[in-house]
């Protein structure tokens, strides 16, 4: 399978994960047939970058998501938190965000700690989606 097909397949898999959690997610390219959207759209408040790569440089991936979400903000004024959802072959999906962005999702941290602003946190899909769903429910007032 070539890398483009692998990427499309990964985006569809991640969209399906969100659909199983109750979101109307779909591939960004499928959304309107052109670029300029996240890899998966239909999930409020976040910019989703999907990667299926055995040798992923997650820092470069999060930087790409940050650049792309900043460009989207310039066009729409919609501020989205970047997250990279990634996995290697035969492994589970993981979600990586900057620690400060994750803290804005989770609301607070039970202890004080000094962290670098470029610190990254990687969580399993199941842990991350619980944090995200609590944030989204609170923010939407549902």
Task: Describe the function of each predicted region.
Residues 1-142:
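Catalytic phosphate/metal-binding cores of nucleic-acid and nucleotide-processing enzymes, i.e., regions
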């Amino acid at each position: 399978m070539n890398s483009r097909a692998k990427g499309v397949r990964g985006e569809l898999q991640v969209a399906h994960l969100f659909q199983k959690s109750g979101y109307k997610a779909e591939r960004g390219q499928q959304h309107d047939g052109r670029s300029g959207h996240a890899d998966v759209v239909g999930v409020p408040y976040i910019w989703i970058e999907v990667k299926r790569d055995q040798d992923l440089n997650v820092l470069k991936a999060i930087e790409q998501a940050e650049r792309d979400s900043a460009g989207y903000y310039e066009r729409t004024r919609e501020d989205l938190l970047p997250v990279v959802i990634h996995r290697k072959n035969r492994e589970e999906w993981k979600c990586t965000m900057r620690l400060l962005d994750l803290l804005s999702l989770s609301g607070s941290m039970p202890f004080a700690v000094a962290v670098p602003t470029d610190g990254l946190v990687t969580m399993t899909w199941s842990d991350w989606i619980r944090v995200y769903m609590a944030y989204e429910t609170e923010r939407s007032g549902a």
